[in-house]
Regions:
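Polytopic transmembrane helical bundles with strong interfacial aromatic enrichment
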Residues: 1-156
């Protein structure tokens, strides 16, 4: 058991970027999920379309880029903390698995939400595409919560 671990100063910036991108990713996923959920629950067509558009844009402009930055930063800090040739602890695998799967789900949710926005502009309503995008964004939040657990508890 490690009681105190002091990192070299050269690790601080990549770790700060990794943690900041993770926090922004979770925040963007939650904001998008709330907007998409409210779009489904709103009875006014104009309000539902605006919420749907906001949720899709939040996914596109914030969540997906932060997921990419998170993965790049994770590799950067892993290369410093665990150089090639050393074995990675189990929590690193949990982190990669959850980060990559949440990125995939967020990209699919972004595509579906954007298609739902396009359908609503054509007057076809939001429909099943929006429900699927909402479900995938909620699933990605659950996966990101697992990642937060793995990164804070660091199970072996």
């Amino acid at each position: 058991m490690i009681v105190l671990a002091i990192r070299p100063d050269s690790w601080n910036f990549p770790l700060l970027l990794h943690v900041a991108s993770a926090m922004l990713l979770v925040a963007a996923a939650v904001v998008a999920a709330v907007a998409l959920t409210q779009a489904l629950r709103t009875s006014e067509p104009g309000g539902a379309a605006a919420l749907q558009r906001f949720g899709a844009r939040t996914l596109l402009w914030v969540a997906v880029p932060m997921a990419v930055v998170l993965n790049v930063d994770a590799e950067w800090i892993r290369s410093k903390e665990f150089p090639s040739g050393s074995s990675d602890p189990a929590w690193i695998g949990w982190g990669y698995g959850t980060a990559e799967s949440s990125l995939i789900f967020l990209v699919i949710a972004t595509i579906l939400a954007s298609l739902a926005v396009r359908r609503s502009r054509a007057g076809l309503g939001i429909g099943k595409l929006s429900k699927a995008a909402t479900g995938l964004s909620l699933l990605s939040i659950a996966i990101l919560l697992i990642a937060i657990w793995a990164m804070t508890t660091k199970p072996s």
